[in-house]
Amino acid sequence: MIFQKILVPLDGSVHSGRALEASIELAKKHESRLSLFTVYSLTGAAGPDRETYVMMVQRARDSSRKILAEAEAKVKSEGIEVETEFTEGDAVQEIVKKSKEGKFDLIVMGARGLSTIKKILIGSVSEGVIKRALCPVLIVK
């Protein structure tokens, strides 16, 4: 199986960092393009006023930009074609939507993210993507 387009959801966790490393190795082997993707969610994060909420949105966007910029620099240093994007929403829905619309051949993602809730083997986002994605999903521990 050849993977020309690989989607790599990132959240800044150790597991997503390992997924990035694995995707770089796969991209080298298959001469693939990587698409680095971050989803932030502010569900239940409404502040006491609009100004606080706007500040929270800006922080989430800034964090997403930072995660993507660092990962993009790493990928480019390996001579791999890369694109980046971030969006707001439900992580599972947005990752699956992006994978379908972009017609990706593979999703490479970390086993667990930044959530404080620990699942036994994999996180709820990873599990949701596995169940709903149309392409293969590689989970990296």
Language model: regions and residue ranges:
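A short acidic, glycine-rich active-site loop
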Residues: 53-66
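Histidine-centered beta-alpha loop that forms part of the nucleotide-sugar donor binding/catalytic region
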Residues: 11, 89, 111-114
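Small/aliphatic-rich secondary-structure junction motif
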Residues: 2-50, 74, 78
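Short glycine/serine/threonine/alanine-rich loop segments
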Residues: 32-33, 80, 104, 135
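Gly/Ser-rich helix-loop-strand patches that form or flank binding pockets
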Residues: 25, 97-141
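Generic structural signal for helix capping and beta-alpha/helix-loop junctions
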Residues: 44, 92-94, 116
